[in-house]
Regions:
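Conserved P-loop NTPase "ATPase switch" module shared by AAA+ and STAND
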Residues: 107-133
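Short glycine-rich substrate-engagement loop in P-loop NTPases that contacts/grips substrate
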Residues: 85-104
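Alpha-helical sensor/transducer elements of the RecA-like P-loop NTPase core
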Residues: 65, 120, 130-196, 200-210, ...
C-alpha cells in the first residue's frame, strides 16, 4: 500500500500501524481458510494483530482530521469494508453499541473497519460506567469476532479496560506536536517562515492553523489565544493553578503548595482542606487530560508539551514577576531535594531547568555557567548515584524540555554538563 501524501511524517507512522494490522488480519483469515480446506494440515497462524487503535491528543491536535484522512485513504482498499464513522459525543454507550452492532451484523466482508471520534465523551461519568458498558457491549464482541478493526480518537489516553481480551488487542498512540520538518510541510502554501512559526506555536496543529489566519501574531498574542483556548471552561482557581503548573516540566502537590500559598500569612487555611483543594484541581486536570501522572518521574506532567509551553509563556509575558518568583522557589526546592542521591535521576533535569530560568535575566552565558558550577560542586556529594539513569534522562528524556534548557544555557554548557555526567557514569562502572 502506498503512503498517503497528505499525511505528515509522524501521522504516516501512525497510519502505517493501521495498515500493518489490516495486513496481519488478512493473513489470519487466509490461515483460517487453509485450515478449513485441509483440516489435517497444520497451518501456522500469525501473531494476532491489535484490533483497537486509540489515537489521542490535546484539543486541536488534529484527531478528527486524522480519522477523516484514514477513512479516505482506506476507502480505496478493496480488501476491507469501512462500515461507518461514529461521533461518540452524539450517543450514549447503549445507543452507540446498538448502532455499531446493527451495522456490523448487516455486513459480510472479511475485514471490517469502524471509526469512532470523541471516544472520551463516554468518560463524562467519573465512575467510567458508560465507557465500560460500551466495552462489554460493543468492543469485546467486535474484538472476539476477529474480523473488525476499531479506530478511535480521544482527547485522553484510554487503557484501563476491564476485559483482558480488549487490553491485549488495543494500542494507544499520541498525536504529538509537529516537528520543524512537518511545520515546513504544513506551511507549504503560505509565505510564513517555519522557524518563526515553530517559535510562535511550538508545533501545535491548532495554533499553526490560527497562525496562518493571523500571520502577524506576536508571541504574546498567540500565547493569550492559547491560554483562552486550552483553559476554556475552567474555574478561575483551577485556571490559576494550571498556569502556575505549566511553569514546571514535572510537578507534585508539594511544589504547587510552595508557589500557590503565601506561607507568611497568619490566617492560613487548614492544611488538610488546602491539600484536598489542590488534589481536587489536579484531578480535574487529569480528567480533562491536561496533565497525567508520570510513574517514572513520580510526578505530574502536561500531556502535550506544546500546550504547556504556550500556557507557560503566557504566564511569563503577563505575570513576569510571578513567573520569576516561581522559578526561584522551584530552583531552591529541587536543588535541595536533589541532595538525596536516590532520587537524582528524577530531580536532576528539573533542578537545571529551574536554576537556568531563575538566572535567565542576567548576562549572556551566566545561566549556563551557574548550572555547570552547581553540577561540579555537587557531583562528589552524589555518592552512589545511578549515573547511567541520570545521563539517560538528561539526554533522552523529554525533547521539548531539553530544547528549552539548551535555549536557556546554550549548547556549549549543555554539552559540558553532558560530559560531566558521562565522566561520572564511566567512573561508576570502574
Amino acid at each position: 500500500m502506498t503512503k498517503p501524501v497528505n499525511l505528515l511524517p509522524s501521522r504516516i507512522d501512525l497510519f502505517d500501524k493501521i495498515q500493518s494490522a489490516i495486513k496481519e488480519a488478512e493473513e489470519i483469515d487466509k490461515a483460517k481458510e487453509a485450515q478449513e480446506i485441509d483440516k489435517t494440515k497444520e497451518v501456522q497462524k500469525p501473531e494476532p494483530p491489535p484490533l483497537l487503535f486509540i489515537f489521542w491528543g490535546s484539543r486541536g491536535s488534529g484527531k478528527t482530521t486524522f480519522l477523516n484522512t484514514v477513512e479516505e485513504k482506506l476507502s480505496a482498499n478493496s480488501d476491507i469494508e469501512i462500515l461507518g464513522f461514529w461521533n461518540a459525543a452524539d450517543f450514549t454507550a447503549s445507543t452507540l453499541s446498538s448502532s455499531i452492532k446493527e451495522t456490523v451484523d448487516k455486513k459480510s466482508s472479511k475485514t471490517k473497519l469502524i471509526l469512532i471520534d470523541n471516544l472520551d465523551s463516554l468518560l463524562q461519568d467519573s465512575s467510567g460506567k458508560e465507557l465500560f458498558d460500551f466495552e462489554s457491549n460493543a468492543l469485546l464482541p467486535l474484538i472476539q469476532r476477529e474480523d473488525t478493526i476499531i479506530i478511535a480518537a480521544s482527547q485522553i489516553e484510554i487503557n484501563l479496560w476491564q476485559e483482558y481480551d480488549v487490553r491485549v488487542r488495543q494500542e494507544n498512540h499520541q498525536l504529538t506536536p509537529l516537528k520543524i520538518d512537518e511545520i515546513k510541510e504544513f506551511l507549504l502554501e503560505t509565505n510564513i517562515d517555519s522557524d518563526h512559526a515553530q517559535t510562535i506555536t511550538f508545533g501545535h496543529p491548532k495554533m499553526l492553523e490560527e497562525f496562518i489566519a493571523h500571520p502577524k501574531w506576536t508571541s504574546k498574542e498567540a500565547s493569550a489565544y492559547a491560554n483562552k483556548y486550552f483553559l476554556e471552561g475552567f474555574p478561575a482557581d483551577t485556571k490559576e493553578l494550571t498556569e502556575k503548573a505549566s511553569i514546571f516540566p514535572v510537578f507534585d502537590i508539594f511544589i504547587l503548595r510552595k508557589v500557590m500559598e503565601d506561607e507568611t500569612e497568619d490566617n492560613q487555611k487548614d492544611q488538610t482542606d488546602m491539600l484536598t483543594g489542590y488534589n481536587d484541581k489536579i484531578n480535574e486536570l487529569t480528567r480533562r487530560w491536561i496533565v497525567q501522572f508520570d510513574v517514572e518521574a513520580g510526578a505530574y506532567r502536561f500531556t502535550d508539551d506544546a500546550v504547556r509551553r504556550l500556557i507557560s509563556r503566557n504566564t511569563e509575558l503577563t505575570l513576569n514577576d510571578e513567573f520569576v518568583r516561581i522559578h526561584q522557589i522551584a530552583a531552591e526546592y529541587y536543588q535541595e531535594e536533589a541532595k538525596n542521591t536516590s532520587y537524582l535521576a528524577q530531580l536532576f533535569v528539573s533542578s537545571i531547568y529551574h536554576l537556568a530560568h531563575s538566572q535567565s535575566g542576567k548576562s549572556k552565558g551566566t545561566p549556563g555557567a551557574i548550572c555547570l558550577r552547581w553540577v561540579r560542586n555537587m557531583q562528589n556529594k552524589w555518592f552512589g548515584a545511578n549515573w547511567e539513569q541520570v545521563l539517560s534522562v538528561w539526554e533522552s528524556g523529554n525533547h521539548a524540555v531539553s530544547e528549552e534548557i539548551i535555549l536557556l544555557i546554550g549548547s556549549k554548557y549543555y554539552s559540558k554538563i553532558t560530559e560531566l555526567l558521562s565522566e561520572n557514569k564511566i567512573r561508576s562502572e570502574v
